[in-house]
C-alpha cells in the first residue's frame, strides 16, 4: 500500500527554501518511505509514529509522522541538524 505525502505548513515553508540538490535527495528517500514508512531504526524516541530521514553528509534531517488511518505520511519539519534544533521543534 502506498501512502500519500503531505506537509504541515511550517515544514512546507522550510521545504521551499531548500536547494534543488537537497530536495532531490529527500524526494528519493521519501519515495521509498511512502511504500514502507515504518523503519524501526529511524523511529524518534519519545514520539508516537514519528520517524526521521537523515542526509548525513550535508547535515539535514526530515521528520515525518505516519497516520495509518488516513494512509498519510505527514512531514513535520525539515532542516539542519545543528544543535538538534530540528528535533526541538517537534516538542
Locations of regions flagged by a protein language model:
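Enriched for short, Lys/Arg-rich terminal
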Residues: 2-5, 10-17, 24, 55-61, ...
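Generic structural signal for secondary-structure transition and capping sites
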Residues: 23, 35-39, 83
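Compact soluble domain cores
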Residues: 21-33
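A short, surface-exposed loop/turn module that caps and links secondary-structure elements
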Residues: 31-55
Amino acid at each position: 500500500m502506498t501512502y500519500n505525502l503531505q506537509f504541515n505548513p511550517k515544514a512546507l515553508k522550510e521545504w521551499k527554501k531548500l536547494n534543488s540538490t537537497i530536495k532531490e535527495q529527500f524526494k528519493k528517500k521519501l519515495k521509498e518511505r511512502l511504500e514502507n514508512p515504518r523503519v524501526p531504526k529511524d523511529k524518534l524516541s519519545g514520539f508516537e509514529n514519528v520517524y526521521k530521514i537523515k542526509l548525513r553528509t550535508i547535515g539535514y534531517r526530515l521528520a515525518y509522522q505516519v497516520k495509518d488511518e488516513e494512509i498519510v505520511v505527514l512531514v513535520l519539519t525539515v532542516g539542519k541538524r545543528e544543535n538538534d534544533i530540528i528535533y526541538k521543534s517537534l516538542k
